[in-house]
Amino acid sequence: PDETARLVDRLVDRRLTWSEAAGIFGTVFHPLAQWAALTRGTTTGSTIVTPDGRWVDPPLEGELASDLLALVASILTGHTTTPDDGIVALWEGHGALLGHMGEGPSRAFFQMGDPADPVLAHHNRMLGTSVKDAWNNVFRRKTWQEGILSREISESPRLELPGRGHVLFRGGVSELARPDWFLDVPWRDRPAEEHGFDPSALSPSIVWPADRAWVLVSEVDYDSTVIGGSREMIAALVAASDLEALEIP
């Protein structure tokens, strides 16, 4: 041949549904399925490789993606008499959510750039030692380390459940039904935005309306969100084409 051409496969980054994963790995997707068993793995916390060579990241544990939360909230809004009033709870153990007394911050933002840049290298070394300095921390006086939430909220009482403490906020599920709900919540991650990250906020751990018509729970160690409520509400969630929801028997 006079010429040759190179054909490369396209890189695709998209969501993989649980039912699709079951088809790929030859398993069965059912209401009590767990990701590790569904993908024939031993853990839910690491990337797996499909039989045809694709890489698949595990689902988020302990929270819903922001767009899925908005979709779920839009459905739940129609199944309560108090869509504008209720409780939103966040697990206190999320990294950097709360301020604390300590020798250094709970996280640091390292900057990417030219490795040969001496200023950048010095900055990143400083950040590294500010997070962990085993030799000098023994002698360092503890000071207040800021979190995403204010000191007043960080030191406030908690909703104590077995093995879990939660920070509570008063708010309605209707506020979470907007696609950009994370822009107006008190726990918006503004420190991350100051370092160039897109606006974001943690998905709530627990949500319930004032009339207690239903409850949404994203347990921190679970790969799914569980919602309890009326048969009509469950049917609406299961029927939503953009959600992968199943009724628990």
Which residues make up each language-model segment?
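Alpha-helical oligomerization segments
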Residues: 212-249
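Generic secondary-structure boundary/loop-capping signal
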Residues: 165-166, 205, 213, 224
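A general structural signal for short secondary-structure junctions and capping/turn motifs
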Residues: 157-160, 206, 217-218, 236
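Intrinsically disordered, low-complexity boundary segments flanking structured domains
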Residues: 152-158, 201-203, 212
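Extended, low-hydrophobicity segments enriched in charged/polar residues
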Residues: 1-194
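Generic structural "secondary-structure junction" signal
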Residues: 170-171, 175, 210, 217-218
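Active-site and NAD+-binding cores of ADP-ribose-processing enzymes
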Residues: 177-179, 203-213
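An N-terminal amphipathic alpha-helical segment
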Residues: 192-207
